[in-house]
Regions:
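Patatin-like phospholipase
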Residues: 2-74, 84-316
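Gly/Ala-rich beta-loop-alpha elbow adjacent to hydrolase catalytic centers
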Residues: 75, 79
Length: 316
């Protein structure tokens, strides 16, 4: 009967099956057309944006449905959070459910101090609960997590050891969250050094870099509504000014339409995920071309501009 509640769910399920079959057909066709052709190592760079980062889940959904093999992931701020959970092995279906239940207080608590208005220590219990593994070495997909050394201003990239504190550091918005101390170094949000971590992804061996930029449209004619707007707009301006630095290391930039969402709009997770899906589907034709070309040769790789090296962490 028209209007039956389960009908829409059934239709969506059928559409998902059709897309999966179509993706499998394309994959088999590629293999038949070019047997033994090495597929370039595709890396995914997930930028920051707080609640807007839910759009990353939509991007990942499309990549999985279309069987696009992501070999390496690097994340900044919320991109590090989403990337860590995904690379640990949590299914996208589970990740989407988690996203719908998230609020600001899932990760943080208000605690006014000389260094910030909130602590993201609740992220420890959140990550302990949702991560399938707790160390970089055990991740199913290699992951780089960025942060910024507060004293030197240099970017730091984590690839080994415990995942939880590096993700906390990557999400530590200056002025909002307290800095995170790791091995004697005070670290803050990775967006200050790597708004979208394309350079670390290249250093990790990515031959094709797909960058996801959560471009915010800052207000030019109205006052900010709250602290989130002040800090979020400040970061958006900085990201825009630094765009030429990280875009040069990207082969393709995907920009979900998140301009109408606030940095604390966790309750709109469904809309944000959908925005990521729409943007990624528009970019699919270009990404599919990567699967039809051989992996980058050492000569071609050397032709790229030199990339800045992150500051090393001291040994344990």
């Amino acid at each position: 009967m028209p209007g039956t509640p389960g009908r829409g769910v059934a239709v969506k399920g059928f559409e998902k099956i059709v897309r999966s079959v179509q993706a499998l057909g394309r994959e088999l066709s590629r293999k038949a057309a070019a047997p033994g052709l090495p597929i370039p190592a595709i890396g995914l760079a997930l930028g920051g944006g707080f609640a807007r980062g839910m759009a990353h889940i939509g991007v990942l959904k499309v990549l999985e449905e279309e069987r696009i093999p992501v070999r390496i992931v690097a994340g900044t701020s919320v991109g590090a959070l989403i990337g860590a959970v995904y690379c640990s092995g949590l299914s996208l279906e589970e990740l989407e459910k988690v996203a719908h239940s998230c609020r600001f207080t899932t990760f943080a608590r208000w605690t006014v101090s000389r260094y910030g208005f909130a602590s993201n220590d609740r992220m420890v219990s959140f990550l302990t609960r949702v991560l399938k593994v707790k160390t970089f070495e055990d991740l199913r997909i290699p992951l780089g997590v960025t942060a910024t050394d507060f004293n030197t201003g240099k970017g730091v990239v984590f690839h080994s050891g415990s995942i939880i504190d590096p993700v906390r550091a990557s999400c530590a918005y200056p002025g909002m969250f307290l800095p995170v101390n790791i091995r004697g170094r005070w670290l803050v949000d990775g967006m200050l050094s790597y708004p979208v971590p394309t350079h670390p992804l290249r250093d990790m061996g990515a031959e094709r870099v797909l960058a996801v930029h959560l471009k915010g449209q800052w207000s030019k004619d109205s006052a900010p509504r709250n602290l989130f707007d002040v800090i979020g707009q400040s970061f958006a301006i900085a990201q825009d000014m630094m765009g030429h630095l990280w875009r040069g290391a990207a082969d393709l930039v995907v920009e979900p339409d998140v301009a109408g969402f606030g940095y604390d709009d966790f309750k709109r997770a469904g809309e944000l995920i959908r925005a990521g899906e729409v943007a990624m589907r528009q970019a699919l034709p270009e990404v599919r071309k990567w699967l039809e070309t051989p992996a980058e040769t050492p000569v071609a790789a050397k032709a790229r501009p030199a990339l800045p090296s992150p500051a090393p962490m001291p040994a344990d």
